[in-house]
Amino acid sequence: MASWDCKKALEWLTKNASASSLGKCARYVRTAIEAGGISTEGRPNSAYQYTDFLPKIGFNLIHKVTGKAKQRDWSNVNAKPGDIAVMNHGKHGHICMWNGKQWVSDFRQNNMWVYSGDGECSIFRYNG
């Protein structure tokens, strides 16, 4: 398995993220993962499907919330740079990466949870 250069992944994602959503979170996070040196061959199309895909490329589930994700206080997650959050909400879900200051996907987010309603959220950390 390839080694993960978290710094390169985060540099690419932070540099290329927009100020508002482009509806392309999975593409942006996937490209960041690739910029960090990990192949995403066989990747899924929708963001929510990365819950099953990330463990195949060296990421471990470190935190999961079901149900009241929107109402959850996310401050105790202790996210580290490079952690990836996958939300199973809506048609395609959402995926984003913590850059050490904020959650980023195809845009620079104000919060991790970007939806108005509740759903499921899984957070992954690279352990390859």
Give residue ranges: language-model regions.
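Non-catalytic ligand/cofactor/substrate-binding and regulatory segments of enzyme domains
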Residues: 1-17, 64, 69-74, 116-128
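...with weaker cross-activation on analogous glycine-rich loops/strands in unrelated enzymes
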Residues: 43-117
